[in-house]
Swiss-Prot record:
Entry protein name: Manganese peroxidase H3
Cofactor note: Binds 1 heme b (iron(II)-protoporphyrin IX) group per subunit. Binds 2 calcium ions per subunit.
The entry's keywords: Calcium, Disulfide bond, Glycoprotein, Heme, Hydrogen peroxide, Iron, Lignin degradation, Manganese, Metal-binding, Oxidoreductase, Peroxidase, Secreted, Signal
GO CC annotations, alphabetized: extracellular region
Role description: Catalyzes the oxidation of Mn(2+) to Mn(3+). The latter, acting as a diffusible redox mediator, is capable of oxidizing a variety of lignin compounds.
Catalytic activity: 2 Mn(2+) + H2O2 + 2 H(+) = 2 Mn(3+) + 2 H2O
Origin species: Phanerodontia chrysosporium
Residues bearing glycans: 100, 155
Amino acid sequence: MAFASSLLALVALAAVTSAAPATTQATCPDGTKVNNAACCAFIPLAQDLQETIFQNDCGEDAHEVIRLTFHDAIAISQSKGPSAGGADGSMLLFPTIEPNFSANNGIDDSVNNLIPFMQKHNTISAGDIVQFTGAVALTNCPGAPQLEFLARRPNKTIPAIDGLIPEPQDSVTSILERFKDAGNFSPFEVVSLLASHSVARADKVDETIDAAPFDTTPFVFDTQIFLEVLLKGVGFPGTRTTRGEVASPLPLTSGSDTGELRLQSDFALARDERTACIWQGFVNEQALMASFKAAMRKLAVLGQHRNTLIDCSDVVPAPKPAVNKPASFPATTGPQDLELSCNTKPFPSLSVDAGAQQTLIPHCSDGDMTCQSVQFNGPA
């Protein structure tokens, strides 16, 4: 569609400020050739992360670390003074402070899981560990882009300021202003970053339910999130006891297979005149999901100077290939359930999944009810 083409053009026009020039190419101990010898340290870290935490799965441990990369980076402010915050690993360096901010509820699991890696791979800074771990986690999610990774962030000595992380109950105006203050993010970049909600689940929005997914394919980096947030809500997967949640189109829950939870902020961004057409433009446009990479390229260096960092993107593992399944209306939903606020662009023609009843969203990527997960004890 024409709108998708224009958005792809915006992705292509992303800033191309270079990192520090690579030094002489090097061969790492395992035989991998890299553009800078400093990148070799991340190869055993990637292997350690996959074997110890992720098991090459786009599961809960991967989801939580991807969330950590965002929460660590966005806590910086141009208006309040960027003396602290940004993508600096301060979540790991101050585990008894930042994880206790209300917006970071539940992030202690990923913080505690990464602290041992900071100790074991002690030549790598906390900020590098957070962003590299997020890049590795994302490679386990089919369809995800291979993120840029720049190394040699210094360790910070003070924690970030509280109150800088957007929350699901925030208004669209508040969210857009927060992103602008953090790093001059455009509305398109904000929506692009929310592509990560395609592989996300919530434990703390409604604490009566566990690992509530935001779409029906939480283990695949696809565009279902952008379609399903546009559908009419009919109920709640849990008890609706907290702020930040609105009715979901697919709330059916059975045992550990939790129904879809809809964030109030996603609902609002999909319907606001400033972002509705951007949101709608992502539906069934898998190529546009690559804009997440461009937006993360910017987010991952907030508070840093790109020209002092080293490009180690060549040690980020190759992601799993896309599933290549077009977006579709889940069973029991259809075009009649769309709540569209963008009237200037045509909506794509999509198929409807067969079934007279709502299909349960599996708790685990293999369809099982019990998933292997890692949880280390720690200070957070």
